[in-house]
Amino acid sequence: MAFTGKFEMESEKNYDEFMKLLGLPSDVVEKSRNIKIVTEIKQDGQDFTWSHHYSGGQIMTNKFTIGKESEIQTFGGKKFKAVVNMEGGKVVANFPNYQHTSEIKGDKLVEVSSIGGVTYERVSKRLA
């Protein structure tokens, strides 16, 4: 499957600006800056299980089916209902305050989120 795999974060751009625009408190932004994130994706046709494993043991998992409404949890911990779509090989979700896209480029998982003119990009390398 195109997205199935385990990916370790290797770089990010515009972290501080994006998290502040999301409304996260500065102490949370500071504390989260150097957290190691491993993303594990399991894709079975249109069904996805998308987990972020954070250093310290916290895990955030979202399960969704492309084109169907699902409950999704955001970076900030908020939960809401959304339809996740596949557009041109990218997984696309419109969160309440921002749009998020994910795609596989070679052995990299590239995640891009945009809010108020700021674009946050996280690139993770494939581990498995």
Curated annotation (Swiss-Prot):
Membrane topology summary: Peripheral membrane protein
Sites of N-acetylalanine modification: A2
Entry superkingdom: Eukaryota
SUPFAM superfamilies: Lipocalins
Molecular function GO labels: lipid binding
Magnesium among keywords: no
Subcellular localization, as worded in the UniProt entry: Cytoplasm; Membrane
Record keywords: Acetylation, Cytoplasm, Lipid-binding, Membrane, Transport
Tissue-specific expression: Expressed in ileum.
GO cellular component: a single term: membrane
Keyword Membrane part of the UniProt annotation: yes
Note on domains (UniProt): Forms a beta-barrel structure that accommodates hydrophobic ligands in its interior. Can bind at least two ligands per molecule, however, the stoichiometry is debated.
Family from the record: Belongs to the calycin superfamily. Fatty-acid binding protein (FABP) family.
Biological role stated in the UniProt entry: Binds to bile acids and is involved in enterohepatic bile acid metabolism. Required for efficient apical to basolateral transport of conjugated bile acids in ileal enterocytes. Stimulates gastric acid and pepsinogen secretion.
Record protein name field: Gastrotropin
Gene source species: Oryctolagus cuniculus
